Amino acid sequence: MDKIIITDLRATGIIGVKSPERDQPQTLLINITLFTDLKPAGLSDVIGDTVSYSTVSKSVLARVAETQFYTLEALADDLARMLLSRFCINAVTIRIEKPEFVANTSRVGVEIFREAVADNY
């Protein structure tokens, strides 16, 4: 399966359980892998035959800004469901990380994989 990869998309949103986390937006790093057939775009060289990186990125940034989840897991699942419903993709991997959130780490996070058919999205 072919992949479209978006790496280290910097999103800002309210996420977390404790008060300091919910008081102001935090920066999140989001990595997205979209599984889809890229052969039509490869043969035609037409942007309409593929998934727009820009549109995906803008959709994710807007969704993170407008939602307020307690867990990264819930945000990741929400983003996966949104992408699977809006774009012509077979599956998606979402990795979300909080930079410098836990002492002595550069970042912590979660990664999920969801399929359109198997997960009924």
Task: Place the predicted regions along the sequence by residue.
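N-terminal, polar/charged subdomain of small-to-medium soluble alpha/beta proteins
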Residues: 1-121
